[in-house]
Amino acid sequence: MTYIQHYDAPLGRILLAADEVGLTGLWFDGAKYFADGLPAEHTERETPVLSEARRWLDLYFAGQEPGFLPPLHPAGSTFQQAVWALLLQIPYGQTVTYGELARQLAEKQGRPRMSAQAVGGAVGHNKISIIIPCHRVVGTGGSLTGYGGGIDRKVKLLALEQADMTRFFVPKTGTALL
C-alpha cells in the first residue's frame, strides 16, 4: 500500500509518498515529473516513514544538515539506482557535474567511461527530490541545468545549503529552463 502526505515547504507544497519499506516519492507540486510512479490507489495517512521524512525536511528547511536519512525505497532501473546511490554521497552544500558523476559511476562499475547524458537522464528521473540531492548536480563550468522542481528552486536549495553561488550561472536557453 502507498501512503501520501503533503508538506508545506518554504519553496512550495511537496507531495510525499511511502510504502511500508521507505519513502518512494517526494515532488514539488507542479514539478516536471510530478507524482511519477505514484500508484492510482493510495491513502493519505501518517506513517513512521512519512514522519521521518517530515522531520528531515523540517531540519533541512531550517538550514541544518539533517545528519540522517529517512528510509528510502525509490523504484527504478539498476542503472538509475546506481546513479541515485552516488547522489546520496554528494556532501551537503557541495556540487558535482554530470561528467564527474559519470566518471564516478564508470569507475565504480569498472568501465572505461560512462555517458554524462545517460547519467543526467537518471538524475532527472529521481523520484525523491531534495533527500536524494539531484539539485547538487550542475553542468560543466557551473551551468545550473535542468531541475524537475524548476531552476529557481535549485538555486534556492543550493543557497540554503550555503553552496558557493558565485560559481554558478543560469543559461539563457536550453534545458536549464525546464
Regions found by a protein language model. Give the residues of each.
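DNA-contacting interfaces and partner/effector-binding or oligomerization modules
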Residues: M1-T24
